[in-house]
Amino acid sequence: MSTLMVQGTTSDAGKSTLVTALCRWLTRQGVKVVPFKPQNMALNSAVTADGGEIGRAQAVQAQACYLEPHTDMNPVLLKPNSDTGAQVIIHGRAVTTMNAVAYHGYKEIAMQAVLESHRRLGESYPVIVVEGAGSPAEINLRANDIANMGFAEAVDCPVLLIADINRGGVFAHLVGTLELLSLSEQARVKGFIINRFRGDIALLQPGLDWLEARTGKPVVGVLPYVMDLHLEAEDGLDQRQTDKVEHVLNVVVPVLPRISNHTDFDPLRLHPQVNLQFIGPGKAIPPADLIILPGSKSVRSDLNYLRNNGWDTAIARHLRYGGKLMGICGGLQMLGEQVHDPLGLEGAAGSSAGFGLLAMSTVLEAEKQLRNVRGRLTLEDAEVSGYEIHAGVTTGPALEQAAVQLDDGRCDGAQSADGQVLGTYLHGLFESPAACSALLRWAGLANVQSVDYHALRERDIERLADLVEKHLDGPLLRELCGLEAN
């Protein structure tokens, strides 16, 4: 078994994308490869085949390998629920919530889980491609590190260092990061990859020559800036839009402090007939056909945030004028009458009034519901698939008019009697073409174009592998993976 790790000089340097690209590039060559990220901090997550929870980036990387996501691919997931605290998920299961200081002392236990998962993957896959987190040169985080060089040292693997030239200062990023590492860690870095380059490569060549002479390490390649690449963001909210046709549906999503699984909206962002707007703090909700309340890792505090921004008043006005309102997961809970958190799972224990638009209430319980599901929307009997990640148990008469009939016999969500309000626990439902089209028609869009989001994602994964093939040193990459040259 061989392990190759990708680390970055900064967050958003391109680590997730490069690991996805390498996984598909190796898979194309018949290599049995698996992705791995020791520790991830993100509110975007996916449900695995073994009934756990991992970061969505690792789920996409699994797709690049034609594998089902598994909890061993991301053994430690941290989901922030306050500015200083996070839910700690080990091997796909929430084990506790702790602040940053407490977690620092917990890292030795977390490292055991990381090494256990890495060992298990190594028993089934000859090549493991690992994604680091943030930067390996964060001085204050280096003690007991499990996400970057601490892991690389523990499993004795080579490292590639990637940097984003589009931000500027790429040579300072690479050299500075290298020099902040220990001598043994520096020796692990086997080469550099420069990401998001625009322009004439000949103008960059003197800098590449200097970098190799200065460090004694090769530049493995320079990846170009890709304008229309659309894969789920690991954590940051992706607000890029594609070109739209003349007649579009206006959809608004209020951005909440603890918004979770905002990748739910990627299919809408890419849809040619949808104008998707994310509205931040202090901004008024503009006229819209559909407002969607997103998932939340802290429903009661985000409800308070909505009200403090005056968005509750804007939503009421939107409904008076005939607009449609949808809630997903935490957004569904907000549509009800009460949200109760007796155990203090998402903050201080207590209860908060919801919007009272659906006759139901939610109690947050310690046991989280994690499922991949299929079913049919009550709208048009459209096929839908998605996943549940929630701690809430919702009850009330509103559920008698369900939004989804699931194949496992359960009903999900609710609709208002007047048809204006719809809520569901299902994340990812817009990725189902039939369900997406049905929901857009419900919101008022005529002549809806069907868009296959899964096909778009697959296309972009293939494009990434093409970039590796064209722009990176393939023989060196294979050598670092313990493979013979082609």
From Swiss-Prot:
Source taxon at top rank: Bacteria
GO biological process, one term: cobalamin biosynthetic process
Spans through the membrane: none
Residues of the active site: C329, H427
Alphabetized GO MF terms: ABC-type vitamin B12 transporter activity; catalytic activity
Annotated GATase cobBQ-type domain residues: 248-435
Keyword field: Cobalamin biosynthesis, Glutamine amidotransferase
Pathway listed: Cofactor biosynthesis; adenosylcobalamin biosynthesis
Keyword Zinc tagged: no
Biological role: Catalyzes amidations at positions B, D, E, and G on adenosylcobyrinic A,C-diamide. NH(2) groups are provided by glutamine, and one molecule of ATP is hydrogenolyzed for each amidation.
Homology family: Belongs to the CobB/CobQ family. CobQ subfamily.
Name used for this protein in its record: Cobyric acid synthase
Species: Pseudomonas syringae pv. syringae (strain B728a)
